[in-house]
Amino acid sequence: MDNSMDINDILLSDDNDYKSYDEDDDSISDIGETSDDCCTTKQSDSRIESFKFDETTQSPHPKQLSERIKAIKQRYTRRISLFEITGILSESYNLLQRGRIPLLNDLTEETFKDSIINIMFKEIEQGNCPIVIQKNGELLSLTDFDKKGVQYHLDYIKTIWRNQRKL
């Protein structure tokens, strides 16, 4: 009976074995480092301290979390996709073809002689396109979107149409 072990004793002895193994690794790494200070911090100590610091910043209050989610949604709403810009282009083209007057800053007789596609691109680049789309429950015009994203997609569409000789 003296030699019999309880399950808890086995578990405790296993934990101690792992701890002694970890301590051996730390002592080996300390041997490799040469320093004059007797009070040096181990690398594992610095990780624990930084973990404690991150732990306090990672637990926001529910109110802060909802504000953060709103900010992320608003930032996402302001990005325009290629699909959305294509819809705006097609709607603008249809309205111009049906007789809508182009909303350009320099409206002249030459504007009416120009291609509808070129007029459509000029309107969008100048920020005068009257098309409004609904995204995430909001009605947005092209001026509400990120200017770089809109211009990037317009340039992409223009290069495709130039390669297809439609522009």
Swiss-Prot record:
Annotated TM spans: none
Chain intervals for the UniProt region annotation (Disordered): 15-41
What GO molecular-function term can you cite, just one? DNA-directed RNA polymerase activity
Substrates-to-products reaction catalysed = RNA(n) + a ribonucleoside 5'-triphosphate = RNA(n+1) + diphosphate
Instruction: Give the main EC class.
Output: transferase
Please provide an example of a Pfam family that matches this protein in its UniProt record. Answer: Pox_RNA_Pol_19
Q: Per the UniProt entry, what are the Gene Ontology biological process annotations, in alphabetical order? A: DNA-templated transcription
Q: Which GO terms describe its cellular component?
A: DNA-directed RNA polymerase complex; virion component
**Domain of life of the source:** Viruses
**What EC identifiers does the entry list?**
2.7.7.6
Positions with biased composition (Acidic residues) = 22-36
Q: Where in the cell is it found?
A: Virion
Entry function: Part of the DNA-dependent RNA polymerase which catalyzes the transcription of viral DNA into RNA using the four ribonucleoside triphosphates as substrates. Responsible for the transcription of early, intermediate and late genes. DNA-dependent RNA polymerase associates with the early transcription factor (ETF) thereby allowing the early genes transcription. Late transcription, and probably also intermediate transcription, require newly synthesized RNA polymerase.
UniProt record similarity statement: Belongs to the poxviridae DNA-directed RNA polymerase 19 kDa subunit family.
On assembly, the entry states: The DNA-dependent RNA polymerase used for intermediate and late genes expression consists of eight subunits (147) kDa, 133 kDa, 35 kDa, 30 kDa, 22 kDa, 19 kDa, 18 kDa and 7 kDa totalling more than 500 kDa in mass. The same holoenzyme, with the addition of the transcription-specificity factor RAP94, is used for early gene expression.
Name of the molecule in the record: DNA-directed RNA polymerase 19 kDa subunit
Originating species: Fowlpox virus (strain NVSL)
